[in-house]
Each structure stands twice: as C-alpha cells, then as structure tokens.
Design a protein with these regions (language model features):
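Elongated, amphipathic alpha-helical interaction scaffolds
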Residues: 1-219
Length: 219
C-alpha cells in the first residue's frame, strides 16, 4: 500500500470512528442498516463503542474495524460489528475475514462472561471500484460454493452498505452519518465547494459542529 493511500485510509478510518463515537450517530446508522426483526431485538438506547485491541493485527492491517455493543431487549448482551473497507480493489474474501472477526468477538466475550453473544456483521464500503463487485455470502468465497452449501447449508449473506449505490435521498436517511457518507460517495470526483456546501447543509439539519468538523477534516 502506497504512503499516500495509507494516509488517506487513516483519514477515512478516523472520520468514520469519530462519527460513530457519538451514540446518536451510531443509532442513525443502525436504524438504516438493521432489519426490522433485528431492530426489534436490539435496545438501541444502550449503544457503546467497544475496543477491538483483541483482534489479531494481521486482520487489522487493511481495514478499520468498529465494534458496537448493545443490550438486547431481553437484557442480554449483543454486538453489531461493522467493518469499513478502503481498498481500491475489493477483496472477494472479505466475508471470510469478517467470519474471523466474528469468532474473535465471541471468544473474547466467552472469556469474560462465559456465554456467546450474537454478532451481526456489516460491511461499509466506499472503495474506488463501484459498485461492490463480490458476493457477501462467505460460502461463495470457497473454491466450490455448491459443495460448500452441501456441507454448511445455505448461509445468509452479510449486510452490505455500499455508498456508491445509495441515492442522495437514501443517504440523507442516515441523518448524523449523512454528511460523511455523502462526502465518501462523492470522493475526489466532486466539486469541493459543492461538497462543503452540501456537508454543511446536512450537518446543520441533522448533526452538530462536531460532525461538521469531522467532515471538513475529511475533505
């Protein structure tokens, strides 16, 4: 990875993390990402950003991992795990890497609490290659997916948020995340003055000066 690309990735990572540190912004994100059933099981009033220092360094070199925890509505612990990917050439094995993350989260929780939580994986993607070109079902990563399904059954694909496929109206539904997502979608192809104006409009409507500063730093 070139020094320029690595520096850009660090800026992206920091902007995404700083925004999701705000529980209200994290809630806006999850309100759009989770299915109605998942939302019915999650207590979104208990969202917390968790450390991910237990995740192996080899898994963290090319991705920014964000782990959000919350209680379920029946009082049990649960996790939402979001992975933000910055590679210009998407990796078709990302679902397998996310499986490793899921197991790492479970193992850490088992060590501390002697029980295994449900982990909901989400890939947030805004890479240069658009739209995201690969399946999100980890079984499709295998050399023989059909045989894999015979062994492992039909697995549900992981959730994907690809900003390049979202309309501006759809992005606005993410409220406090909208300004950052709009900027990520536009990338370097948009007019900077227009991007700044749109970002300010969105943060004035949904966010705060903190969110605005994050987006302006990103630009």
């Amino acid at each position: 990875m070139s020094e320029k690309v690595n520096k850009t990735s660090l800026i992206h990572d920091a902007a995404f993390r700083k925004t999701l540190k705000d529980p209200a912004a994290a809630r806006d994100f999850l309100e759009q990402v989770l299915t109605p059933y998942q939302k019915s099981r999650c207590n979104l009033d208990t969202i917390e950003l968790e450390p991910t220092t237990f995740v192996a360094e080899s898994l963290r070199q090319s991705a920014c991992d964000v782990l959000l925890s919350m209680k379920t509505n029946d009082g049990k612990d649960g996790y939402i795990y979001t992975l933000i990917e910055h590679q210009s050439s998407p990796d078709k094995f990302i679902p397998l890497r996310m499986m490793r993350y899921i197991l790492a989260v479970m193992e850490q929780h088992i060590e501390e609490h002697k029980c295994a939580p449900v982990v909901i994986p989400v890939l947030f993607y805004h890479g240069a290659k658009r739209p995201y070109p690969y399946p999100m079902n980890w079984v499709d990563c295998l050399d023989d997916p059909a045989y894999g399904r015979e062994i492992y059954g039909e697995q549900k694909p992981f959730s994907l948020v690809d900003v390049s496929t979202l309309t501006d109206d759809e992005i606005e539904h993410y409220h406090r995340m909208a300004a950052l997502m709009f900027t990520m979608k536009s990338g370097t192809s948009g007019d900077v003055i227009e991007l700044i104006g749109k970002s300010i409009t969105l943060t004035d409507k949904y966010g705060s000066s903190v969110h605005q500063n994050i987006v302006l730093t990103y630009l």
